Amino acid sequence: ILTAILPIAVSKCSERSFAKPTVSTSDTPEKPKDSGEILCALTAGLYKNSYSAETLKAIAILMNTNYRANPDSFKANDFLYEENASGSIKDVYGEIKKAAESAKNKTLRKNSEALFVPYSETSNGTTYKNENYKYIHSVASPWDCYQTDFDANAECVGVSLSGIDYLCKNGYSAEEALLWYLPDFEIADD
């Protein structure tokens, strides 16, 4: 059924173009944090009001994988700790904690190895292969064109967060949504 819908979705994607909003986060705190707080802060750093609880869980699995695979790839503004949260994020930080808690022992793995998985807010309807991430394949992501921040010129390698959100809101589990974008991976319990 999905393949029958793809041509319609792809043609719709080419009709619209929107600017991407930016997301800002706070600096890391001065005192060291445990791994649960770090995972929660990374998940919160990517939070959007529109994300479902299942989307937050998928993001937490992705962040857990990436932090374990390459902790040095993160910058201070990638983290949003609870004490630095404000506004709507402060109000839902409990939900973010719950998502991070449910994902703290889960990682995406290929051939039993946790590998860094790149991600973007959205794609142009397809994710791309990249020389730096030879273990990532191109997949269709036609539902990205329904996002308000859709950019027909966006080049996404790996996972589209908007695509993950769309799938999770339409019945996919966090794990199923991630595996749509990463068909050669598995989700392992550590």
Language-model segment annotations:
Residues 1-190:
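Conserved, single-site charged/polar hotspot
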